[in-house]
Design a protein with these regions (language model features):
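Long, amphipathic coiled-coil "stalk"/hairpin helices in large membrane-associated assemblies
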Residues: 1-51, 75, 81, 119, ...
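Elongated periplasmic alpha-helical coiled-coil
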Residues: 4, 11, 17, 42, ...
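Residue-level detector of conserved, well-ordered beta-strand and adjacent loop positions
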Residues: 9, 37, 84-87, 117, ...
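A structural signal for short beta-strand/turn segments enriched in small hydrophobics and glycine
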Residues: 16, 24-33, 69, 100, ...
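Alpha-helical coiled-coil segments
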Residues: 40-109, 127, 152
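Hydrophobic alpha-helical membrane-insertion signals
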Residues: 128-130, 136, 140-262
Length: 262
């Protein structure tokens, strides 16, 4: 059994002041996972607001200067150089105002980043932090198993692949819940595997590596078949569960369809 695992990491640094969740808890998208002390980021936001206000005042002043120089130039009282100087000063202040507004936007974002929320529905695992801990941007503090993303990788012999077609119904049985099977559908069949005989070079992890059962007998290769779960399973699903799948009137439902993922 497999699923998408989302690593939860802050986008800013600081001490954690609140963790309202616990390990192995089910959460919904939008639930607060943890909060970083916002004090420094509130101060930075106030400073950015003040900088924008100051730059806006400077721009207004430079606009007035430019308007005056424009009028004087039209009356042939001011030189073109003085007019150009006023233009350049106004353009410089406008650029600084744009930078100040960008800093303000970033300060607003950083303050918002002090609260980290669940991006999807799922189950928390490996929560390895606590209030008071100082964290850095990008530190993965916990993992969130996406509860809507469970799928199965079943390894079938290449001799069985002609009978395995996308959208074919399969019966799924999870070890420990053999009396509660449920259905799924074939999603896709892998287009390649890493050859263990060395002819494929060194594994890069881009192709699935499937171990042969007996080295001295030429056995059919096994290819991963991705199976999606249809409907709501009657049992709790966990990454790494041992699963047996039986494809409708096609391949053998036992060892050939056995999929065990660490």
């Amino acid at each position: 059994m497999r699923a998408n695992v989302v690593g939860i990491a802050p986008r800013i640094a600081g001490p954690i002041i609140n963790i309202p969740v616990h390990d192995n808890q089910e959460v919904k998208a939008g639930d607060l996972l943890f909060e970083i002390d916002p004090a420094d980021y509130k101060t930075a936001l106030d400073s950015a607001k003040a900088a924008v206000a100051n730059m806006e005042a400077n721009v207004r002043q430079k606009q007035q200067d430019l308007d005056r120089e424009t009028e004087l130039l039209q009356r042939n009282v001011a030189s073109r150089q003085e007019f150009q100087n006023a233009q350049n000063a106004f353009a410089s202040e406008m650029a600084q105002l744009a930078a100040a507004r960008a800093n303000l936007k970033q300060a607003e974002l950083n303050l918002g980043y002090t609260k980290v929320y669940a991006p999807v529905d799922g189950y928390l695992t490996n929560v390895n932090t606590s209030p008071g801990a100082y964290v850095h941007a990008g530190d993965q503090l916990l993992a969130l198993v996406d509860s809507s993303s469970f799928w199965i990788a079943a390894y079938f012999k290449e001799t069985q692949l002609p009978s395995i077609k996308p959208e074919r119904t399969v019966k799924i049985t999870v070890m420990g819940y053999r009396d509660q099977p449920f259905e799924g559908r074939v999603n896709s069949v892998a287009w390649g595997i890493f050859l263990q005989d060395g002819s494929g070079g060194t594994s890069t992890g881009l192709l699935a590596a499937v171990n042969q059962t007996v080295d001295w007998v030429r056995l059919p290769q096994r290819f991963p078949v991705r199976i999606r779960i249809t409907g709501k399973p009657p049992i709790p699903l966990r990454i790494g569960q041992t699963v047996t799948v039986a494809v409708e009137a096609a391949a053998s439902p036992t060892p050939e369809g056995l999929s065990k993922q660490p």
